[in-house]
């Protein structure tokens, strides 16, 4: 149902991603930005507090009627769990403990992962590094939808369904685009997570377990914060590959909206990205950006020129080394 989109293919490009060149140019002009490339130990206490709040919510919802449980799962738990996935994004860049304590960050990522209900942090780290190094590379960057997604989700209604099911596509897309051997850390992540889920079930009951899982599924689907999935790299304007968002939801998402700044300087923690924009304002103020993720979701669904195919894609160069 709804109009069919006009785009029937990805936007193939044969140039390098813009972020490395812009990073070099900005650092040559503003070397003080290097001082922003440092750990953010505040993440340790923020993440711990978020997990404790979610544990408290497990107790508060355990005896609710199902309708109210689902209401609070969407209205509250989803915000907390989506925010936690973006905390895990910060952790994947080694910001809590720094690069010299990489394994501390991996263990902390598994700790942050607990409230999500499904193992996520270790696999995300492996694929997210590819996303930065090989942005848009065919068969490597699993942030790019599959051809099936672009072909099938091609009407207004189907695009809405695609948005609702986004967490499932992000979970299973790597298996089709860029499958990797399972590592021992992924096994450990899974064992820890399943053990925690079983404990939630035995301590709080099935309703708390459903609340936790539904919060992740709903929070990563049709949800205001989920606008960042589409806002970051979907090509609403031809020739522009990455877009920043400067609205209030950055307060809940560790400034993930500062996405041009993040790709230009992936070693700068989220709390310092507004300073990058302030220092090098002439490089960012004139780039296309958003102020509403809700509007991004609406435009994606309703605009007949936008679809899962609206991504810039590059052929792999043949020398990519993946972990």
Curated annotation (Swiss-Prot):
Pfam families found in the cross-reference section: FA_desaturase, Lipid_DES
Sites of Phosphoserine modification: 307
Highest taxon listed in the record's lineage: Eukaryota
Main location: mitochondrion
Lipidation positions, renumbered (N-myristoyl glycine): 2
SMART domains from the UniProt entry: Lipid_DES (SM01269)
A GO term for molecular function: sphingolipid delta-4 desaturase activity
Subunit-level organization: Interacts with RLBP1; the interaction increases synthesis of chromophore-precursors by DEGS1.
PANTHER family noted in UniProt: SPHINGOLIPID DELTA 4 DESATURASE/C-4 HYDROXYLASE PROTEIN DES2, SPHINGOLIPID DELTA(4)-DESATURASE DES1
Protein name: Sphingolipid delta(4)-desaturase DES1
Species in which this protein is naturally found: Rattus norvegicus
